[in-house]
Amino acid sequence: MITDPKMLELLVCPITGGTLSLNRKTQELISLEAKLAYPIRDGVPIMLASEARPLQNNGKELHKK
C-alpha cells in the first residue's frame, strides 16, 4: 500500500501525465483523465496501460464507498 503522500505526488498517469488518486478500498491508483485504474500489487503500483482496468460510469464508481 502506498502510505507516503509524497510518493503519490510523484506518480503520474503514464498515458496522460495527469495526477492519480489512491482508492484504498480497491488498492488502485485512479486516473480520471484516462478513465483507468492501475492496480497496486504487494504494495507496488503497476503503471502499465495493459494492466489497467477501465473505470465504469466515467469514474462515478469511486464515489460509492
UniProtKB/Swiss-Prot annotation:
Q: Which family does it belong to?
A: Belongs to the UPF0434 family.
Please tell me one Gene Ontology term that the record gives under cellular component: cytosol
Organism field = Bartonella henselae (strain ATCC 49882 / DSM 28221 / CCUG 30454 / Houston 1) (Rochalimaea henselae)
Q: Which Pfam families match?
A: Trm112p
List where this protein forms a coiled coil: none
Please name the PANTHER family in this protein's record.
PROTEIN PREY, MITOCHONDRIAL (PTHR33505:SF4), ZGC:162634 (PTHR33505)
Q: Which Gene3D superfamilies match?
A: 2.20.25.10
Q: What SUPFAM superfamilies does the annotation carry?
A: Trm112p-like (SSF158997)
- Domain of life, per UniProt, equals Bacteria
What protein is this chain from?
A: UPF0434 protein BH12860
